[in-house]
Amino acid sequence: AAGKLGIHIDLYESRYGQYQQDILDHKSGLYAFNPNIVVLAVHEGDLHLPEYSQRPEEDVRKEVSRWTGLWQMVTEHSRARIVQHNFALPCEIPTGHLTTRLSGSRYMMTQAVNTRLGEAAANAVSLVDCERLSALIGKQRWCDPRYWNMSKQAVALEALPLLGRHTAAVIAADLGLSRKCLVLDLDNTLWGGVIAEDGLAGIKLGQGPDGEAFVAFQEYLLKLKRKGVILTVCSKNNHADAIQPFEKHPEMRLKLQDIALFLANWESKPDNIRTIAKTLQIGLDALVFVDDNPVEREIVRKFLPEVDVIPLPEDPSYYLRTLSDYLLLETSSLTAEDTERTDQYRARAQIMELEAAAGSIEDFYRSLRMQAIVVPFDASQLPRIAQLIGKTNQFNLTTRRHGMAQLEAFVLDSSYVHLALRLRDRYTDHGLVSVMIARQQGDILDIDTWLMSCRVIGRTVETTMLEQLCRRAAQLGCTSLRGTYIPTQKNAMAADAYAKHGFERVGNHEGFEVWTYDLAAKGLIANTFVKPVDSWELADGAC
């Protein structure tokens, strides 16, 4: 595995069970060998832990101290970088699922040792996460008792290639041999479809199976960028077409400022890749080419053999996994400069922690530093808006379903007011989460559709939508708003939406409730917890 990465290895191997003696004896063959890398290829059986402990914290502390002591000895007697395998948890557990409730069990102590070693390693020691690798391949495939009984081989033969590849990748990162830069195609790579032919509204990006896959892929790319991987674009496209999604598509996660070098032209991919390497002053062997087109991939392989090429599968749902399986983007450390913000999956947990710690609900809202972009519908948003209208049931006042054709008609009809809201807070961008459609009838602005994604319920987003509708009504010279609530089996939570914002119920016809708001008498509805902004670039304090 190391040879395939360009690492030439001269190997010193301790005798079976003698690695500790080699490390502790400064005159051992290990130090005479003068290693650059010391790999501690250990396994769960090497842990000095009892099957059950009455003092698990103390036993874990001692075991971690034993391993960090070995690290210290290597550091004192050599210049070697240390790479250690952590400990794959066994699958044969006598106490079964009860084990996770027994802090003194060997299983739980092993988990704790893994965690503490990760904390202790910092930037001095690299760990190969064997626990994760064993889960990837399957616990029962990771360790075959036949090989252990015959030769004390802790890792099954079929799992050794996986372990070898990952160990080699960690060594490569320690030696500075990881790849630094992704060269990204655009059409059918970052989004579905061809931007020059399908237009901004026609590409697949956002909600829906394919669209969500491309969003997920972009989000993973952003995470790579945050750990220091350079992102570049190499696309056969007109530049003006190619930048449109980056500048205008609301579901585009990558922005132009995330791209170090953007090349969209009709030059050959090899020529453009050479330009990228030259401009950024990095070698071709630092580049990784990512393109859905097998012909373009083969051309790059042929003319630029130094460049690694990712073989993307046909189904974009597997783009993320394919790139995740590519190991030469491994890094040996992470600094504050490499990371920008907490990822979206951790954001939800952080928000819940923040709410629990807040002194009041008002304090919680303020602490989120929420901001919203509220704009009229545009073509790129319509597929997402149509989907929201089609599937939102809980906070949906009328549950009227409007398709693409109707939405396009609303956009063209000047008597309609239509608003789409995107929400962002201190943790994440929630995307397009609320929609409102109203029609002017004289001095009344009548609300036809008002809905909100369940992801942001309880965040005062509904107040912001009414605030913006009031402002638009005032601009049109309307003196009142009118809304309808049509009860269903699923939208009971929206029953008081009008009442709590000062509307008065004026009628109830065949189960339909009609509400009005006297704009002239009561003034604009306002929300002090969500700050309206024109663009995220102008939104201070977020993320």
Question: Which positions does each model-derived feature cover?
Answer:
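Substrate-recognition element of Asp-dependent hydrolases with the DxDx(T/V) motif
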Residues: A216-P250, L263, L397-R400, Q406-L407, ...
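Acyl-donor binding region in acyl/amide transferases
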Residues: R426, L432-N508
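A conserved beta-strand-loop-helix scaffold within acyl/acetyltransferase catalytic domains
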Residues: K248, I373, F377-R455
